[in-house]
Amino acid sequence: MYKRQGKDFLQKKAFELEIVNTLIHYDVELVVMAGWMKIVTPFFINKFKNKIINIHPSLLPAYKGGSAIKDSILNGSKITGCSVHFVEEEVDSGSLIMQAALSIRDDDDIESLSKRIQMLEHKILPHSISQAGFLIRTNFMENY
């Protein structure tokens, strides 16, 4: 079940269509997926090709998907961080806009590392939005 503004949707396609229509209605130039935690369909991506960005809690291409923080700890990584990238059909695979790194401490657990990464995300997301806007407005993404 998908919900949007108190409205229930049984199918993902109907849910995405509602969102797409709303974004088109408001002539949205950039879609920012921060905390979205859902994989969008090719239908959605193609409606806003090169105009969707996502923030992800790892230094991509390492640790794609929903368990990036847990995986970085379990694999004994010493450094992690966050990445902002353009959204493509393959999960966490689009062109990188910006990354920031931090050390994983010996006493870090999923909760403590998540909080530290989130603080880093809050620092780079505004700059990434500005950079993405520049790339879109100058049509740079066609050759990116």
Describe every region a protein language model picked out.
Residues 3-144:
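One-carbon transfer enzymes
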